[in-house]
Design a protein with these regions (language model features):
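Short conserved beta-strand and strand-loop elements enriched in small hydrophobics
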Residues: 60, 104-110, 157-159, 327-332
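C-terminal recognition in membrane/secretory proteostasis and scaffolding
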Residues: 1-29, 48, 118, 132, ...
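Short, well-ordered loop/turn sites that connect or cap secondary structure elements
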Residues: 86-87, 99-100, 143, 149, ...
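Glycine-biased strand-turn-strand hairpin within the trypsin-fold
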Residues: 23-93, 98-115, 125-128, 134-138, ...
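Gly/Ser-rich catalytic serine loop of serine hydrolases
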Residues: 75, 79-83, 141-144, 191-206, ...
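Conserved hydrophobic positions within beta-strands
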Residues: 83-85, 117-119, 173, 283
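Active-site loop architecture of trypsin-fold serine endopeptidases
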Residues: 77, 102-104, 138, 158-170, ...
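Active-site substrate-binding loop(s) of clan PA
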Residues: 48-49, 108, 118-120, 137-164, ...
Length: 350
């Protein structure tokens, strides 16, 4: 009799433990959209995220400026892409390639309002441009600076593909830190399988809370001709987009430090016993500031401004943050000997 009473209790306890493992949000009394749909018999939906984020994603158009005012007003409007309202003050982030060459920029909000936009500044290297409109009661995209994109996160891409109207596509973050994919040499893409089509560029990649994860920018297909892969799109991480936006608002341009080194990452393996066991950048070409400082081809750059070199991307980002004209120490390995040099930071050519 006791066994008959205890057995259902034991099964219930095991089931409860399994549910807590599968749905950890139940431990603190909250539920994800997915778990709510299971327990409440509701369809799974990201409509709340769309309601939060979509109003802040705008359509961007251009219009040719004609020398005759009346004809200028009647000039055809060309769809360019999308943009994201980042501030109630009217600042909008889009891609550099979306508005490059546009004579007059028109911004259309989802509530039907239309505004002329003024360019604040652009950065070709990161493919970011900032526009400004004069308007009140603007929706702003939510930004959570403490939430980093993680592989496997569900994301929504919001934009105006092919000018058919605002469209939402869904996928996951497939990878982070992708580099070397852009014609503008930008680094650290977010890769997603959410569809990013022509016209989505400059739009928002958001998480299931409607928070901005990145600025949609391109698909892998652009460089592959007829060999078009599916499910490979890229976005500029929010942190980088915000950083560039703030610099453009403040200065109208982005000034980066530069030392004039081309090189390859140097990371010796167990089979290279005759080489030094260090991480660094094997210099293939030195020019400008590095040449003047005494850096030579085949040197291994191992330290910049008292910080060890771990990767090309990290070191170039570090140098980019240094103010041109600043003198910093660097250490190179040359024929097995450490040599300290002083280098004057230059300005990265645009």
């Amino acid at each position: 009799m006791l066994k008959k009473i205890l057995w259902p209790i034991l099964i219930g306890a095991v089931l409860a433990i399994v549910l807590l493992i599968i749905f950890p949000s139940l431990r603190n009394g909250t539920q994800s959209d997915f778990s709510r749909s299971i327990f409440n018999d509701e369809p799974m939906s990201y409509s709340n995220a769309v309601k939060i984020a979509a109003p802040a994603v705008v359509n961007i158009y251009s219009r040719s400026i004609n020398s005759v005012p009346k004809q200028s007003q009647d000039s055809p409007i060309t769809p360019l892409g999308s943009g994201v309202i980042m501030s109630e003050l009217g600042y909008i982030v889009t891609n550099y390639h979306v508005v490059d060459g546009a004579e007059q920029i028109i911004v259309a909000l989802q509530d039907g309002r239309i505004f002329a936009a003024l360019p604040v500044g652009s950065d070709k290297l990161v493919d970011i441009a900032v526009l400004k409109i004069e308007a009140s009661n603007l929706p702003r995209i939510p930004i959570n600076s403490s939430r980093d994109p993680k592989i496997g996160d569900v994301v929504l891409a919001i934009g105006n593909p092919y000018n058919i109207g605002q469209t939402i596509t869904q996928g996951i973050i497939s990878a982070t830190g992708r580099d070397g994919l852009s014609p503008y040499r930008r680094q650290n893409f977010i890769q997603t399988d959410a569809s990013i089509n022509h016209g989505n560029s400059g739009g928002a990649l958001v998480n299931t809370k409607g928070e901005l994860m990145g600025i949609n920018t391109l698909t892998f297909a652009k460089n592959l001709g007829n060999d078009v892969p599916e499910g490979i799109g890229f976005a500029i991480p929010t942190a980088l987009a915000v950083k560039i936006m703030n610099k453009l608002i403040q200065d109208g341009k982005v000034i980066r430090g530069y030392i004039g080194i081309d090189g390859l990452e140097f990371a010796p393996t167990q089979n290279t016993s005759d080489l030094p066991k260090v991480l660094g950048i094997l210099v293939t070409n030195a020019e400008g500031p590095s040449l003047q400082a005494g850096v030579q081809a085949n040197d291994i750059l191992i330290m910049v401004d008292n910080k060890p070199v771990k990767s090309i991307v990290e070191t170039m980002d570090q140098i980019a943050e240094l103010k041109p004209g600043t003198i910093v120490p660097i250490i190179v390995l040359r024929n097995g000997e450490k040599i300290q040099l002083q280098i004057t930071i230059g300005q990265l050519p645009v």
